[in-house]
């Protein structure tokens, strides 16, 4: 939320002060925490159950938390990949609008951002299912707790890179996070044939 408030809104003409951005980000964090706590509180836990059932209860909690990190990953994907996709178009439009002068910084028209967003959505709709299947189950078996760890690490890395202006690949970052989760259980937990093709 803080990256959006500090960096994103200024491109659409809604500059927010730094202090207000931190306050709104803290409120958003508290709201997300409250929603997560309500969802986790609804899960039925049985303290008299056996050990395997306790692991299932933990996975139920992480299934709820996974929804939050999946939203974070979607945000990170949009904040990073749309910028990577529209960068060359924005540069060309800037040069054309300035009469051939190359400037250090220029405004970004909203229609360019929308074209980038539509392109990302179209790409996900057409080829996204193959990437999701490979990352979600092809590299290693993922439980909700493993998926939570991988998406939290990948989303945090991508948002940090987007906020600092580093162009990185969201997909490669997520694949690296999934590999890390798989390696935590040993090299045998990873499908090396799939990793070679990636």
PLM regions and their residue ranges:
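Multi-pass alpha-helical transmembrane bundle typical of ion/small-solute transporters
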Residues: 1-198
